[in-house]
């Protein structure tokens, strides 16, 4: 399950993430789910408030060059997937 905590400081995060404007720019297309049971794999995210609940911690950055993962939020869960299957974080978030 991808239970995501957005950290306040970069050194607390497992990875830095930049939200990109277009799907074609993304390493990962992600979908935000409201239910824990639906937060499966790396691409379906449930945001949590506490570190103890999180399976993966991210720090949001402004520029693509600063990011470990370039991410694009999709509207439907079927669209959520890694666009770059060889990315070093594949299988590590959930």
Regions of interest found by a model, annotated:
Residues 1-94:
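Repetitive, compositionally biased segments used for assembly/scaffolding
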């Amino acid at each position: 399950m991808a239970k995501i905590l957005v950290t306040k400081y970069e050194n607390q995060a497992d990875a830095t993430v930049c939200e990109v404007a277009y799907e074609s720019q993304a390493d990962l297309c992600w979908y935000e789910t409201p239910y824990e049971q639906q937060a499966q794999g790396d691409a379906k995210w449930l945001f949590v408030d506490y570190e103890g609940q999180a399976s993966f911690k991210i720090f949001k950055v402004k520029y693509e060059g600063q990011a470990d993962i370039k991410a694009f939020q999709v509207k439907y869960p079927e669209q959520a997937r890694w666009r770059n299957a060889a990315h070093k974080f594949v299988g590590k978030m959930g």
